[in-house]
């Protein structure tokens, strides 16, 4: 990764009556614009996210999406949909006076990157996508319902289902929704920790015991659940795949961990079949972007796409 430099410009943008989103710029003010779209939904961005981009070459824009990270109010699901986030990205672009930019997103960030590019293809110079997630029911069931990745880590799955009454475990995402939006804050926080611990375990190539902070877990747990319950506000399983025609001309590199248990290879494969113009690069790695094999592959992908952006 590149040196993590401090932002030269940052602030908050009022994007609705309720929400203010945090934004920042780092790197070269006159460089090639790139926006980093974090995962989750609800994960927020960290300073380390700047490290995928050469700060001498890129004007690096990072935002925390509605309800998470440094954005306000925290863990708020009201007025918080995929299309709200797409509109927010455009508002940030317009505020910063950027004509076109490279869009970089992983996991949920790949969903949002594709949704944004298909809505505003004229504003996208290129796409670098990692850990493809298309927000299809089959993907959310794999993650958070019995019979998917639960078969690989049954001992951790037992902890994930523990907050849910046995007679409600046939629809876990729905059952968790009731807990994560419960009026009792302690109920919300306990459920959020169980949800986030499960996901944190899955994203590591070499799993280790995790113990996430309950309050810090609330945004990712509540917002992921909110989006999953609502199908990401996408029209059907193939909503993104059926609109690839809008972005075929955009240079695109897909980086996918072969052993990714959070966003399995199947979705990257489906995207590459629908979008053969994109280059699919499979790495011997899991899901977490900061694991060394994925870091190297992502830095290389950004370097390789750069000539197409100039």
Curated annotation (Swiss-Prot):
Record-listed E.C. numbers: 3.4.11.5
GO molecular function, one term: aminopeptidase activity
Catalytic activity as recorded in UniProt: Release of N-terminal proline from a peptide
GO BP: proteolysis
Subcellular location: Cytoplasm
Keywords: Aminopeptidase, Cytoplasm, Hydrolase, Protease
UniProt-listed InterPro entries: AB_hydrolase_1 (IPR000073), AB_hydrolase_fold (IPR029058), Peptidase_S33 (IPR002410), Pro_iminopeptidase (IPR005944)
Residues forming the catalytic site: 107, 260, 287
Residue ranges constituting the AB hydrolase-1 domain according to the UniProt record: 33-290
Domain of life: Bacteria
Entry annotated with the keyword Cytoplasm: yes
Leading EC class: hydrolase
Gene Ontology CC terms: cytoplasm
Family the UniProt entry places it in: Belongs to the peptidase S33 family.
PANTHER family: PROLINE IMINOPEPTIDASE
Record function comment: Specifically catalyzes the removal of N-terminal proline residues from peptides.
Name listed for the protein in its UniProt record: Proline iminopeptidase
Source organism of this protein record: Neisseria meningitidis serogroup B (strain ATCC BAA-335 / MC58)
GN (gene name): pip
